[in-house]
């Protein structure tokens, strides 16, 4: 029946399943018999198929900083495109950065942060993503800008759709917060997208009789589910609890800090105290949904397939002018419909477009909220020393790739597609760089490039987008709803192409296409680079406890820890070689006996007397040297 409220059930589709489809097959991909699991090394190969240098960008401003990275708004010097550069600042987070790059390169959804490319500098990978002009959801909620209930419901629906897509791929976020939900400001309203997939993990499958090992305790404590904080078994329902905390932030416009959002001693939501923060203008189903998602029992939390349907139903039930219409009409009988006030009628009540929480200033540390009782509450996160009051971020050391994210290649296993450098990264008509010294990032040899007609980059059509096939899932059809959905972004405005020549054609009509990182990545540079006595410089991404190459090398007697490896049919990335993805019969490069001074040089080192003029950025990024 039209308008009937969809039920909220606890158990939903199994991990990796899509509604209406069965579980993944024995092969793990769910694409039918005979289709094997795609090799994970090709996922990384495609993710870094286009490399940019730090010097290719002009740093506009620093827009944020997290626990492990700094975020900059940058502009590409040649194309003028504005992007976001997420620079990793801790060596211990290198694995998570690589895991995030691999995953984001294969996610295609309007409510998932779009991956633009990779910037490499001094052996570290930094992700390039689209720029969101609205900032984070946390910043929007703490601002004095009014947000009506339809706007808040649309923001919640966008986040739920992004997570529904992510879960349909067999992956869950594990670090969903209002800081990691970004907002795009448009003429028609706001659009929310989900970002920061550094802690994403495959959805575990706990079988009866099998040994069950819990995943690591990771995430931001204020949004972490109780079962995660207790070190118990957890799955994708932990994302549902985090989504419930985000809904509480949306409804009451308060931070997730327990000093403002009341919590219980078992890390649950203090429902009676939270109700005192919510005005009577809040749609009751919206409030009940937030309480339902924060249930302490994971099995009772609804999956995102049902949460999105429920949010769409709530939007359909809202009155046309605003959810405060019934209350506002008792005070102002002259209010008119959305078409605008008439010259002969009184001005409509301003609360028609604003919720009750908009009528008050955002909370401040000096004025804690009044929860309507005199009970003394204790911050449960301050009772555990390892959580440090909840103002930290728990990180895990990645071990394996999150997903085999690359579809099967149409080429034979002995024939790998070439890696091409986009023409926009190289000035048209200029010869290949003679200077290969650090700290400039490696540039693929010119012989690997594809000749592009014309002076500028060609337009990349929808056929260049790759379809993602992994873990028993197919492209998920988006049900029609009142929330505005952006069409899937194609790479026409991207200066960096994130697809290889083995990509499969994709049509927007077919619907949205659909970290446990290796501990070490060794990237060998092309021949001719300076930096070592035998003209073979190398970038090294060692384990978390390893130091930079600029540090003094260990004594020769120290044992060298071998790199983990997975078999692959050949060398990866052409001139680049990733140790954890390839087990080629090559000797391990010896440790440099002398300190590498290339990273400290003030000018570039050139060969054969040729000196290239370094770029002169007006505002240098951290670590960028010319």
UniProtKB/Swiss-Prot annotation:
It holds the Pfam family PK_Tyr_Ser-Thr. It is found in: Cytoplasm; Cytoplasm, Perinuclear region; Cytoplasm, Cytoskeleton, Microtubule organizing center, Centrosome; Cell projection, Lamellipodium. ATP binds at residues 63-71, 86. The active site is at residue 175. Residues 527-626 are annotated as: Required for interaction with SPRED1 and SPRY2. Required for TESK1-mediated dephosphorylation of SPRY2 and SPRY2 inhibition of ERK phosphorylation. Residues 57-314 form the Protein kinase domain. Expressed in podocytes and renal tubular cells in the kidney (at protein level). Its EC number is 2.7.12.1. Residues 8-26, 476-485 have a biased composition (Pro residues). GO terms for molecular function: ATP binding; metal ion binding; protein kinase activity; protein kinase binding; protein serine kinase activity; protein serine/threonine kinase activity; protein serine/threonine kinase inhibitor activity; protein serine/threonine/tyrosine kinase activity. The modification Phosphoserine is found at residue 220. It catalyses: L-seryl-[protein] + ATP = O-phospho-L-seryl-[protein] + ADP + H(+); L-threonyl-[protein] + ATP = O-phospho-L-threonyl-[protein] + ADP + H(+); L-tyrosyl-[protein] + ATP = O-phospho-L-tyrosyl-[protein] + ADP + H(+). Dual specificity protein kinase activity catalyzing autophosphorylation and phosphorylation of exogenous substrates on both serine/threonine and tyrosine residues. Regulates the cellular cytoskeleton by enhancing actin stress fiber formation via phosphorylation of cofilin and by preventing microtubule breakdown via inhibition of TAOK1/MARKK kinase activity. Inhibits podocyte motility via regulation of actin cytoskeletal dynamics and phosphorylation of CFL1. Positively regulates integrin-mediated cell spreading, via phosphorylation of cofilin. Interacts (via both C- and N-termini) with SPRY4 (via C-terminus); the interaction inhibits TESK1 kinase activity. Interacts with TAOK1; the interaction inhibits TAOK1 kinase activity. Interacts (via C-terminus) with SPRED1 (via C-terminus); the interaction inhibits TESK1 kinase activity. Interacts (via C-terminus) with PARVA/PARVIN (via C-terminus); the interaction inhibits TESK1 kinase activity. Interacts with YWHAB/14-3-3 beta; the interaction is dependent on the phosphorylation of TESK1 Ser-437 and inhibits TESK1 kinase activity. Interacts with SPRY1, SPRY3 and SPRED2. PANTHER family: DUAL SPECIFICITY TESTIS-SPECIFIC PROTEIN KINASE 1 (PTHR46485:SF3), LIM DOMAIN KINASE 1 (PTHR46485). This is Dual specificity testis-specific protein kinase 1. It comes from Homo sapiens.
């Amino acid at each position: 029946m039209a308008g009937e409220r969809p039920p909220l059930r606890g158990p939903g589709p199994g991990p990796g399943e899509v509604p209406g489809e069965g579980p993944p097959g024995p092969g793990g991909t769910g694409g039918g018999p005979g289709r094997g699991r795609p090799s994970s090394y090709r996922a990384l190969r495609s993710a870094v198929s286009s490399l940019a240098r730090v010097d290719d960008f002009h740093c506009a401003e620093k827009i944020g900083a997290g626990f492990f990275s700094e975020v900059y708004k940058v502009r590409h010097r040649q194309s003028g495109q504005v992007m976001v550069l997420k620079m990793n600042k801790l060596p211990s987070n290198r694995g998570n950065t690589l895991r995030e790059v691999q995953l984001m390169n294969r996610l295609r959804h309007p409510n998932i942060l779009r991956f633009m490319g990779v910037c490499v500098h001094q052996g570290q990978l930094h992700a390039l993503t689209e720029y969101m002009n609205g900032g984070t959801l946390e910043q929007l909620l703490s601002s004095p800008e009014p947000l009506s209930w339809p706007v808040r419901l649309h923001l919640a629906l966008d986040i739920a759709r992004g997570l529904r897509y992510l879960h349909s791929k067999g992956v869950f976020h594990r670090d969903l917060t209002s800081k990691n939900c970004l907002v795009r400001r448009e003429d028609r309203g706001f659009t929310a997208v989900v970002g920061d997939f550094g802690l994403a993990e495959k959805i575990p499958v706990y079988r009866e009789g099998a040994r069950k090992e819990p995943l690591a305790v990771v995430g931001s404590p204020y949004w972490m589910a109780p079962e995660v904080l207790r070190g118990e078994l957890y799955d994708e329902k932990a994302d549902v609890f985090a989504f419930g905390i985000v809904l509480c932030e949306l409804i009451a416009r308060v931070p997730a800090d327990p000093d403002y959002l009341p919590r219980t001693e078992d890390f649950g939501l203090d429902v009676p105290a939270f109700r005192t923060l919510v005005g009577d203008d809040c749609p009751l189903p919206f409030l009940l949904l937030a309480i339902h998602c924060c249930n302490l029992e994971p099995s009772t939390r609804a999956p995102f397939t049902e949460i999105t349907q429920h949010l769409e139903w709530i939007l359909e039930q809202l009155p046309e002018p605003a959810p405060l219409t019934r209350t506002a009409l008792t005070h102002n009988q002259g209010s008119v419909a959305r078409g605008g006030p008439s010259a002969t009628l009184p001005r409509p009540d301003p609360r028609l477009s604003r919720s009750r929480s908009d009528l008050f200033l955002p909370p401040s540390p000096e004025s804690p909220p009044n929860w309507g009782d005199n009970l003394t509450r204790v911050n449960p996160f301050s009772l555990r020393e390892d959580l440090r009051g909840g103002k930290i971020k728990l990180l895990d050391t990645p071990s394996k790739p999150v997903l085999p994210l690359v579809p099967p290649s149409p080429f034979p296993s002995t024939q790998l597609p070439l890696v091409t450098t986009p023409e926009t990264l190289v000035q048209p008509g200029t010869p290949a760089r003679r200077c290969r010294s650090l700290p400039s990032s490696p540039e693929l040899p010119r012989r690997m490039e594809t000749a592009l007609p014309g002076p500028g980059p060609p337009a990349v059509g929808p056929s260049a987008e790759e379809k993602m096939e992994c873990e028993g899932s197919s492209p998920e059809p988006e049900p029609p709803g009142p929330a505005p959905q952006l069409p899937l972004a194609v790479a026409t405005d991207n200066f960096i192409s994130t697809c290889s020549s083995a990509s499969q054609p994709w049509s927007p009509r077919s619907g949205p296409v659909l970290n446990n990182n290796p501990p070490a990545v060794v990237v060998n540079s092309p021949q001719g680079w300076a930096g070592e006595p035998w003209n073979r410089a190398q970038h090294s991404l060692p384990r978390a406890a390893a130091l930079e190459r600029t540090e003094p090398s260990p004594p020769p007697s120290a044992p060298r820890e071998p790199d983990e490896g997975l078999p692959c049919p050949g060398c990866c990335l052409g001139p680049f070689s990733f140790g954890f993805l390839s087990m080629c019969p090559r000797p391990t490069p010896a440790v440099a006996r002398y300190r590498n001074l290339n990273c400290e040089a003030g000018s570039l080192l050139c060969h054969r007397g040729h000196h290239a003029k370094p770029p002169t950025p007006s505002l240098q990024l951290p670590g960028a040297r010319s």
